A protein has these predicted regions:
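Bacterial Sec signal peptide processing site at the extreme N-terminus
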Residues: 16-35
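Sec-dependent bacterial lipoprotein signal peptides
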Residues: 1-19
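Surface-exposed short loop/turn segments
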Residues: 25, 53-65, 71-72, 76, ...
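Post-signal peptide N-terminal segment of mature Sec-exported envelope proteins
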Residues: 29-51
Length: 136
């Protein structure tokens, strides 16, 4: 019986951790994300996707945390590739819904934002060109 409590407690903690925004790595804080094209002189690296949330924990995560986490995930992935500039191509919020009926045969339901996905093109730019100090 004691192991059931441990399992339940562990599951609860894991679920709550899923409600927090993905943390941005210290170096990734310097990655600039903009809808503007990369300046001339920047080198294209790859496309990156940042995501936060899913159908299970997304409904328990605030929209602000979903948005912040997806942006942090994008920055972390771009930084891991050596990029310091991301041209944001798309930003989408995923909605999960349900349909239900009522006692009078009416149709009802609900929907909630459960994830956010950002897609962008990652570039490495001369730091001075994008407003970063040369040591960045």
């Amino acid at each position: 019986m004691h192991s059931y409590y441990k399992f339940g407690y562990s599951f609860l903690l894991a679920s709550l951790v899923g409600c927090a925004a993905i943390v941005v790595n210290p170096q990734a804080r310097k990655v600039i994300v903009s809808p503007n094209h990369a300046p001339k002189g920047c080198l294209y690296i790859d496309q990156v996707v940042g995501n936060q949330g899913n159908f299970f924990v997304g409904g328990y995560t605030s929209n602000a945390h979903l948005e912040e986490g997806a942006m942090n995930d994008l920055r972390n992935k771009a930084n891991a590739l050596g990029a310091n500039y991301v041209q944001l191509i798309s930003n989408r919020a995923g909605i999960t819904g349900s349909m239900g009926g009522s006692y009078d045969n009416g149709v009802g339901g609900s929907s909630t934002q459960t994830n956010v996905t950002n897609v962008g093109n990652a570039y490495h730019c001369p730091p001075k060109l994008i407003g970063l100090s040369p040591s960045a």
